[in-house]
């Protein structure tokens, strides 16, 4: 991935700049997972490896994981922090039969993971 001047320029909003910086710290692993999910498509309700990749990353980052929620073995809930502010992110990782990730769910998974990791870091610093 190539970094542009716009991507490295200081953001005028300090809070957004902190979150962007927190994301950049996790960007290599987030992109690696998005690419791995793309290279290993699993259709709905069979995406065990994709779920494991995503859940394991969040668990390593300090999230508490509940796997197999809502009677779906490939679903999970990851939580971190406490208090009245709640952010919910949907991590989609299923592929289309015969098309793979033409739907872009691998990218949605990566975006959601990146957002979760960046926001969690800000939560630990009590800046969100």
Feature map (PLM): residue ranges:
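N-terminal acidic, proline/glycine-rich, low-complexity intrinsically disordered segments
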Residues: 1-8
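Acidic/His- and Gly-rich active-site-bordering loop/insert found
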Residues: 9-124
